[in-house]
Amino acid sequence: MINNLNLENIKVVIFDYDGTLAIHRDKDFVKHRNESVDKRLNYYANAYQKPSNFYIDIEPCDRSEVLYKLVQELRNKNIKMYCLSGMKFSFHFKAKQDFINTQYGDDIELISVGTQELKLDGIKIISELNKCSFDEILYIEDLEDTVKFLKSKGINVINVNEIKWGVC
């Protein structure tokens, strides 16, 4: 049971990808990915060509065990799940979807929103598609700036690091 999450009125849960569903072993992965133009282009080419092993061998990530347990609970409650990822390019879209499918299951739909700033628009669209209010959506994010921004816009958001698993 999740100690500090009230899922009673939640119809949709939306996850961030990097640092939330996918825990990068290299905490400076963005810096290392962009050290040179060649390295950056090679990164995206590898993700496109080898999506099934990209987040295993090239940019290793682990799943969040707390979120894995939460996903199981959400699935049992028939709560719809999405992942909004602020991708510069969509060349690594398949790699991200493959990681999600392998680590969490194939019922989390990945959506690219281009930038962190467009996440609010993504949430609004998901709200419309699912015919639910912001109060019925829970967004889970690791970046505190994004958490604060979304809260200021009326979004029900929690920092992934605040989720506690245990007996209620």
Which functions belong to the PLM regions below?
Residues 63-67, 119-122, 143:
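Amphipathic coiled-coil/heptad-repeat helices and related helical stalk/stem segments
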Residues 134-168:
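Acidic, Mg2+-coordinating phosphoryl-transfer loop and its flanking beta/alpha structural elements
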Residues 1-2:
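Short, basic/aromatic recognition patches
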Residues 71-75, 127, 147, 151:
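Surface-exposed amphipathic alpha-helices with a cationic face
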Residues 7-99:
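Alpha-helical substrate-recognition element adjacent to the catalytic core
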Residues 9-11, 78-80, 132-137, 155:
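Short coil/turn segments at beta-strand junctions that form active-site/ligand-binding loops
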Residues 86-137:
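Substrate-recognition "cap/lid" segment bordering the active-site pocket of phosphatases
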Residues 20-22, 27-28, 88-91, 116-117, ...:
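Short, solvent-exposed loop/turn segments at secondary-structure junctions
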